[in-house]
UniProtKB/Swiss-Prot annotation:
The keyword Metal-binding applies. One of its GO terms (biological process) is cholesterol metabolic process. InterPro entries: Cyt_P450, Cyt_P450_CS, Cyt_P450_E_grp-I, Cyt_P450_sf. It comes from Paris polyphylla (Daiswa polyphylla). Keywords: Cholesterol metabolism, Heme, Iron, Lipid biosynthesis, Lipid metabolism, Membrane, Metal-binding, Monooxygenase, Oxidoreductase, Steroid biosynthesis, Steroid metabolism, Sterol metabolism, Transmembrane, Transmembrane helix. Expressed in roots. It catalyses: cholesterol + reduced [NADPH--hemoprotein reductase] + O2 = (22R)-hydroxycholesterol + oxidized [NADPH--hemoprotein reductase] + H2O + H(+). This is Cholesterol 22-hydroxylase CYP90B27. Its main location: membrane. GO terms for molecular function: heme binding; iron ion binding; monooxygenase activity; oxidoreductase activity, acting on paired donors, with incorporation or reduction of molecular oxygen. Pathway: Steroid metabolism; cholesterol metabolism. The gene is CYP90B27.
Length: 484
């Protein structure tokens, strides 16, 4: 009897959801006659499933292609049970990002908030987001990049690439990029040394955490999402111990404390709670690790497909190394980095075609009008930032990897065209320059040490995060002495 009652109540709930879904959709569409065209899809789930289908990161995907062909670059749908405007219009996307806090606000999915934490920069808006972002910006300022980050980036790159020597079998370039980025971030966030037991423990839990980020958000025993929440607790415990240790050392007046890591930065904000600090550290580990590791893997992938670019890149770095040797200098400096002109073209093109971040979630704070369309207050807005990178009206042959296109674009135009790679407006990624610096330094040593080729076919896939289905397996062979 109890089971029958549960079934009846469950059926009634489903019917009510469907009824109110249709009813609310109908009201929304009748209220404003100039909503963007589109369809809401199935009741409740809408078009979430086709929207989230994996596809090549160098494309918009079948869902976007079909809807753009049918409705144009701005259309309406239902994603994650919410009425949503999807924009592949570069002008509208920039308008959205530039009006953050006035017409639009960040709208992080609930599942991401739960796994990243309520104080993660991904989830915050308003004054608290500005404060957290200010900490991140100061931590990764140009001065810090030159004096604090650059030497360690080079040291970690040399260490990772040294492990590739005498390795005849194929290995995952994606995993090597992740190892490089992770070791670098934990050292600069919390002064944790690579290879130490607590660092390896953190890395193991972080990988489980990331698998849950890319899973269906079902908090049930055995699911990747549940395991990710458990890993989050372990990660925060490890980070909390490091924070408590630093606070104790400062209180006891210990000498020789690290003054440049993130723990030192947050100690200057005593009003922040421990929970806020730990969520900030975790969100910065996530942002710094995922962006940089993906960018390095993409560069390896695209350069393999474009030998001419790889050779020109190699020639640039061999020449930089030769000039440094003549001056008796060791170790890269900021002037060397600025001298890497073709390298910056490679970086821009890799970010453009690779599309590490495909879209952003926003929500309207008031009724918005744009290009003749009315967008109601409270609606979700998904900006497809990769659309500008693949727009033939902006880039000739946008599907082709062509670093030389950036040689003909002024610095201002380059900034305007590439800024979407790292979001924009008040939420522009504070680690954008750090990611580019990591790419440049890694490539400087990679192209002077090795030739490489894909061991088997693989390609970058979007959704929910960028990755290579096979891990980007490569084989390497050392350069001849005459080439280096």
């Amino acid at each position: 009897m109890a089971l029958e009652l549960i079934l009846v109540l469950s059926s009634l709930i489903v019917i009510l959801i469907i009824f109110f879904s249709f009813k609310s959709n109908g009201k929304s569409e009748n209220k404003l006659a100039k909503l963007p065209p589109g369809q809401m899809g199935w009741p409740f789930i809408g078009q979430t499933i086709p929207f989230m289908q994996p596809h090549s990161s160098a494309s918009l995907g079948l869902f976007m292609d079909q809807n753009i062909a049918k409705y144009g670059r701005i259309f309406r749908t239902n994603l994650l049970a919410k009425p949503t405007i999807v924009s592949a219009d570069p002008d509208f996307n920039r308008y959205i990002l530039q009006n953050e806090g006035r017409l639009f606000e960040n709208s992080c999915p609930t599942s991401i908030k739960e796994i990243m934490g309520p104080w993660s920069m991904l989830a915050l808006a308003g004054d608290i987001h500005r404060e957290m972002r200010s900490i991140a910006v100061n931590f990764m300022s140009n001065v810090k990049l030159r004096t604090y980050f650059l030497p360690d980036i080079e040291q970690q790159a040399i260490k990772v690439l040294a492990s590739w020597e005498n390795t005849p079998e194929a290995f995952s370039a994606q995993e090597q990029g992740k190892k490089f980025a992770f070791n670098l971030m934990v050292k600069h966030l919390m002064s944790m040394d690579p290879g130490m037991p607590e660092t390896e423990k953190l890395r193991t839990e972080y990988h489980a955490f990331m698998k849950g980020m890319a899973s269906i958000p079902l908090n049930l025993p055995g699911t990747a999402y549940r395991k990710a929440l458990q890993s989050r607790s372990i990660i925060l415990k490890i980070m909390g111990q490091k924070l408590d240790e630093r606070i104790r050392q400062v209180r006891d007046g210990c000498e020789g404390l690290e003054q440049d890591d993130l723990l030192a930065s947050v100690s200057k904000h005593p009003h922040l709670t421990k929970e806020q600090i730990l969520d900030l550290i975790l969100s910065m580990l996530f942002a710094g690790h995922e962006t940089s590791s993906a960018a390095i893997a993409l560069a390896i992938y695209f350069l393999d497909s474009c030998p001419k670019a790889a050779q020109q890149l190699r020639e640039e770095h061999v020449e930089i190394a030769r000039q440094k040797a003549e001056r008796g200098e060791t170790g890269l400096n900021w002037d060397d980095y600025k001298q890497m002109e073709f390298t910056h073209c490679v970086i821009n093109e890799t970010l453009r075609l690779g599309n590490i971040v495909k879209f952003l979630h926003r929500k309207t704070l008031k009724d918005v009008q744009f290009k003749g369309y009315d967008i109601p207050c409270g609606w979700e807005v998904v900006t497809i930032i990769s659309a500008a990178h693949l727009d033939p009206s902006v880039y000739d042959e946008p599907q082709r990897y062509n670093p030389w296109r950036w040689q003909n674009i002024s610095a201002t135009a380059s900034k305007n065209n590439s800024i979407m790679s790292f979001s924009g407006g008040p939420r522009l990624c504070p680690g954008a320059e750090l990611a580019k610096l990591e790419m440049a330094v890694f490539l400087h040593h990679l192209v002077r040490k090795f030739h490489w080729e894909l061991a088997e076919h693989d390609y970058p896939v979007s959704f929910p995060f960028l990755g290579f289905p096979k891990g980007l397996p490569i084989k390497v062979r050392p350069l001849e002495k005459s080439e280096a």
